[in-house]
């Protein structure tokens, strides 16, 4: 693929922001405030730091590779084929589940805005069209995908930027005191709020999955991951601060905090601006899933871990077979509605991306001490160790059923790994030389 057709630095940043900023930011101010009051600003900053530690590990690992795969690739070279298989397959499965859920979420939100589209048949049609439409966009290659992603991401940020720029003049300082309201704060509130808000920062881990579609990924990916986290952190802090400053204690009782706050500032037009922003944001997250999901399967197929057909590309260099298979699975899940239970796997799966990558940074420093890196985390092993500890702590917060579903997912795919292992042992599969 020509370098001119690939994602440049700022397009990678926008791709990352699109993968992180979803509909959650339109709802989180209410949930966070109801748990811990205006101290939620401190919790959000705390989460930015700990999520940032994990993101820095991804940045350093990304500086060593140019292939697609991201966390799967890091696990393969640091921990071996078995853990790579578990990380890669679970990531692909969970992305399919997440895409189905997000497509239905978009259809549901559109139905709420347009009552005529709120019936089950309309939701099925809308979710199906959305998944198929975004798949077609991706099949036309990186140039088209880059343009669509840039357009969607900027469009989703405009309503949020307007909310912040206008809302900052309507902040009431008295709404920030007391920091810990007596009728809200109880023991354990900080941890509860920290877990809730942490997931608002997740999504950065998928940026490196499509490294081959990016200009100079060893240099640009680490910088883009760091820039994404900085911009998203500032955005989240500003949105929460304006929401608290405008609504005060009413923030704990509203179901649409950003929408209600903007309505209080500029009237009904503010509510509609946020509604449009919410729909665009949901569409953006769907696009991100459509873009990343096939590339996980393609990278594994190139290594012989999945059927070789999934590695096929068309004249636009798009992984069209993997894209079609992913889309079919997502549509069927969306129409069945069975993704709700399966989504429990995602809580555990996310940390199967984090832990191996954080460990990989430490292993790569020893294994490839002389290998050139465009980025190295300062402070020695301190930040990777903090990131590992954070991942374990967050995993410990998962519900028992989520842990069981995650463990079940790991076990179910074992026979497929055994099949791969037998073929590799027989010399039928060779390792991919490129990194």
Residue ranges and their predicted role:
Residues 1-3, 41, 45, 117-124, ...:
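Helix-loop-helix junctions that connect adjacent transmembrane segments
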Residues 5-16, 80-93, 126-130, 184-197, ...:
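Select transmembrane alpha-helical segments in multipass membrane proteins
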Residues 31, 35, 43, 52-131, ...:
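Hydrophobic transmembrane alpha-helices that form the core helical bundles
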Residues 109, 113, 132-136, 164, ...:
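Alpha-helical transmembrane segments of multipass membrane proteins
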Residues 1-30, 34-39, 45, 51-52, ...:
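Membrane-interface "cap" regions at the ends of multi-pass membrane proteins
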Residues 122-173, 184, 225, 229, ...:
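Membrane-interface loop-to-helix entry segments
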Residues 73-74, 80, 111-116, 226-289, ...:
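TM-loop-TM module centered on a large, flexible mid-protein loop between adjacent transmembrane helices
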Residues 148, 184, 309-320, 354-403, ...:
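C-terminal membrane-solvent junction of multi-pass transporters and transport-like membrane proteins
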């Amino acid at each position: 693929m020509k370098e001119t057709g690939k994602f440049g630095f700022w397009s990678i940043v926008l791709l990352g922001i699109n993968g992180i900023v979803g509909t959650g930011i339109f709802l989180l101010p209410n949930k966070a405030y109801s748990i811990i009051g205006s101290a939620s600003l401190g919790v959000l900053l705390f989460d930015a730091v700990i999520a940032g530690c994990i993101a820095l590990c991804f940045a350093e690992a990304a500086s060593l590779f140019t292939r697609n795969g991201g966390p799967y690739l890091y696990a393969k070279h640091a921990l071996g084929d078995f853990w790579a298989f578990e990380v890669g397959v679970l990531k692909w499965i969970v992305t399919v589940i997440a895409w189905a859920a997000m497509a239905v979420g978009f259809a549901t939100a559109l139905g709420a805005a347009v009552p005529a589209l709120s019936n089950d048949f309309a939701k099925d049609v809308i979710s199906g069209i959305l998944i198929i439409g975004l798949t077609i966009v991706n099949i036309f290659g990186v140039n088209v995908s880059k343009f669509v992603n840039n357009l969607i991401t900027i469009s989703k940020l405009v309503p949020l930027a307007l909310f912040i720029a206008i809302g900052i003049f309507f902040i009431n300082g008295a709404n920030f005191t007391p920091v810990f309201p007596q009728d809200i704060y109880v023991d354990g509130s900080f941890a509860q709020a920290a877990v809730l808000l942490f997931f608002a920062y997740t999504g950065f881990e998928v940026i490196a999955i499509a490294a081959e579609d990016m200009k100079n990924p060893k240099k640009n990916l680490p910088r883009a991951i760091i820039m994404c986290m900085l911009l998203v952190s500032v955005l989240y802090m500003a949105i929460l601060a304006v929401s608290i400053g405008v609504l005060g204690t009413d923030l704990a009782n509203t179901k649409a905090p950003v929408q209600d706050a903007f309505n209080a500032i500029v009237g009904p037009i503010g509510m509609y601006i946020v509604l449009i922003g919410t729909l665009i944001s949901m569409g953006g997250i769907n696009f991100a899933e459509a873009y990343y999901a096939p590339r996980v399967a393609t990278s594994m197929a190139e290594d012989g871990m999945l059927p070789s057909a999934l590695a096929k590309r068309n004249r636009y260099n798009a992984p069209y077979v993997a894209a079609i298979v992913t889309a079919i699975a997502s549509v069927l899940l969306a129409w069945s509605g069975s993704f709700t239970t399966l989504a429990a796997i995602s809580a555990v799966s996310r940390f199967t991306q984090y832990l191996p990558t954080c460990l990989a940074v430490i292993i790569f420093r020893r294994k490839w001490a002389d290998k050139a890196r465009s980025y190295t985390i300062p402070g020695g092993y301190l930040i990777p160790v903090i990131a590992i500890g954070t991942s374990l702590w967050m995993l410990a917060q998962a519900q028992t059923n989520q842990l069981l579903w995650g463990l079940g997912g790991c076990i179910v795919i074992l026979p497929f790994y055994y099949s791969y292992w037998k073929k590799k042992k027989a010399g039928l599969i060779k390792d991919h030389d490129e990194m």
